[in-house]
Amino acid sequence: YEIRLSLVGSEMCIRDSTFTLSNGLRIIHAPNLSKVAYCGFAVDAGTRDEYEQEQGMAHFVEHLIFKGTEKRHAWHILNRMENVGGDLNAYTNKEETVIYSAFLAEHFPRAVELLADIVFHSTFPQHEIDKEVEVIIDEIQSYEDSPSELIFDDFEELIFPNHPLGRNILGKPELLRQFTSRNALEFTARFYKTTNMVFFVQGNIDFKKVIRTVEKAVSDISLSETNRQRIAPFTYIPQTLTINKDTHQAHVMIGSRGYHAYDEKRTGLYLLNNILGGPGMNSRLNLALRERRGLVYNVEANLTSYTDTGVFCIYFGTDTEDVDHCIRLVHKELKKLRDNKLTGAQLTAAKKQIIGQIGVASDNFENNALDMGKAFLHYGKFEGPGEVFKRIEALTAEQLLEIANEMFAEEYLSTLVYS
């Protein structure tokens, strides 16, 4: 196995260790001194991997995976970690599904055995499906009642038309009501394979114990490959669309396709995104739209990178009569970044801010564990904050100007308005 070291202060410490079992399952472990540990499976399967007739299946499986295995009923799964103060959780997005647990480190073997059981031996009982489908439909209806959330999905549909990346993760009620145990088993048979997932662990647990415990839990699972070919995104054509919604406020998205997860320019766009509409109250868009003019309550810029494409978008909500004014102000700020190279002081301040934000965010073991699992799944490694900081520090004003002119060109942007 591989162990990576990093220098912290004047002491050398183990940062993360990796190992691949004989059945192809990759393991990554990052130690810490916390009494709480996290572990789980990150599966390389999400919404974009569904067939047309099984839209919503990845998320559906994520819900039903807790509802019964060959040796456990739903009640036993629910209580297995809860009885020792731990919990089970999961999430689905466009490209992966993650099933994980949080617990006191002493209960690591219990968590691993349970996770392996539900990931590899779920039976998806039909009577549980019939109940859970209604729960998911309630989730869909709740989501549709929140235009500030729904518009993000509709925007991806706008820039990825007729493509799996443009689909809503939750699926469609009329399809969900047709799903059966067999459908769920067919989906997991395609993607829930050892070579198509990783197992991640963060906690005060000896790495040799990690390997032994995981190896024992998946000893009955053989090496298997996934024959999967993802459909590449179609040619991007900027679109402008207005949808009439019965809401008190207008909601607006402006953006385009962004860089994919392996593109070196992604770090530069990440910094520009933060300058424009990051979480800081001093972001350019927040100053221009909220602080100076009081036109919006919330304005934010977001960046999502997939394995072969990405999404850059700006969101704000405002009064209907202020929509055009706000859109002009957004384009004005984008033009400033296209036309004016950042000064040395501006670049230094932007780097310092985002490095501080990353540092604060990294002080969360659960987020670190999930980020580590996702990174190891897609990159085969996990970059600690120090490596990310180096890439940020290496950025130049010239690089950012080039990226701004490529990504923020007005003719390249799509606009979606709920009014």
Where are the predicted features?
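Single conserved hydrophobic/aromatic residue that forms the stacking wall/gate
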Residues: 1-14
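Active-site alpha-helix of zinc metalloproteases
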Residues: 6, 55, 199
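Charge-rich, well-structured scaffold segments of protease-associated domains
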Residues: 20, 76-226, 232, 242, ...
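His/Glu-based metal-binding/catalytic segments typifying zinc-dependent metallopeptidases
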Residues: 28-33, 40-42, 225-282
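Short pre-active-site segment immediately N-terminal to the catalytic Zn-binding motif
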Residues: 43-54
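Active-site SXXK
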Residues: 56-69
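Phosphate-proximal small/polar/acidic motifs at interfaces that engage nucleotide phosphates
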Residues: 286
